[in-house]
């Protein structure tokens, strides 16, 4: 499995299409600048890739609304759940390595893994972890990792008895916890933590030198966009920048900055 076509989807990419005509970059520039205002965003970085080559890039807005530093094409953003694509890619690499198979039961590699239903526990496959169809409702269990210091196994074990809302593989339910389980699976099979495996097998081979899986590593970089929040989540309130939170318990589901 090639890494490059998978990770191409992670970039902020606008396709140039198949037409030989020169695109109107001035119109695109105006569109992007307007998007920052229209959607009330602190900043935005856009890149256009054609045939594997970066043909245009530009930054808009500010890294921090309280300061003047502008977003550039090289600005680092917290990419949140786009981190899941890296996790799926890492699982795919292990499949290619012959270390596991998509249809392997999760308990084959993680005997301690449990769900509230013994049948689901026995039949949950590797691919099920990535498909948001476990039976839990969207965001079920997220309060176990957000703002806590629980480690990943503890999070999964604490959540194991939470009743399913849907039948197994019957309904979509967006699950951060199943991607946390996927991160634990990567460690169980490879002997390396999720962050170490992603760094060694994906980031380094692709030369992604301005991508980090550790929030603490952002101290080594400049040109970093800060997250922003509205007071009381009031849509009419002004946005304020906030400090990055360490979300180690959610590795696999989130955590990458790029």
Across the structure, where does each feature detected by a protein language model lie?
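Bacterial N-terminal signal peptides that target proteins for export
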Residues: 1-7
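Bacterial N-terminal signal peptides
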Residues: 8-17
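Short, conserved catalytic-motif segment at the N-terminal edge
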Residues: 23-77, 99-101, 108, 151-153, ...
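A generic alpha-helix surface/boundary motif
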Residues: 30, 88-89, 104, 180, ...
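Short active-site loop at a secondary-structure junction
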Residues: 38-45, 66-129, 164-177, 251-254
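Short, surface-exposed loop or secondary-structure junction motifs
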Residues: 64, 118-258
């Amino acid at each position: 499995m090639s890494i490059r076509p998978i990770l191409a989807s992670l970039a902020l990419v606008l396709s140039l299409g198949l037409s030989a005509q020169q695109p109107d970059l001035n119109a695109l520039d105006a569109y992007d600048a307007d998007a920052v205002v229209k959607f009330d965003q602190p900043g935005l970085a856009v890149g256009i890739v054609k045939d594997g080559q970066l043909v245009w890039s530009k930054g808009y807005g500010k890294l921090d609304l309280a300061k003047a530093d502008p977003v550039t094409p090289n600005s680092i953003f917290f990419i949140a759940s786009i981190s899941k694509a890296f996790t799926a890619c890492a699982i795919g690499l292990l499949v290619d390595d012959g270390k596991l198979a998509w249809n392997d039961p999760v308990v084959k590699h993680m005997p301690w893994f449990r769900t509230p239903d013994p049948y689901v526990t026995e039949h949950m496959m590797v691919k099920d972890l990535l498909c948001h169809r476990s039976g839990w409702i969207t965001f079920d269990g997220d309060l176990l990792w957000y703002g806590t210091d629980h480690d990943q196994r503890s999070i999964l074990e604490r959540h194991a008895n939470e009743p399913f809302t849907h039948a197994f593989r019957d309904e979509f339910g967006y699950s951060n916890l199943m991607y946390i389980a996927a991160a634990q699976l990567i460690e169980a099979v490879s002997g390396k933590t999720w962050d170490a495996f992603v760094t060694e097998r994906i980031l380094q081979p692709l030369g992604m030198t301005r991508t980090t899986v550790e929030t603490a590593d952002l101290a080594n970089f400049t040109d970093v966009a800060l997250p922003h929040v509205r007071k009381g989540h009031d849509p009419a309130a002004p946005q304020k920048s906030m400090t990055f939170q360490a979300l180690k318990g959610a590795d696999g589901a989130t955590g990458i900055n790029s």
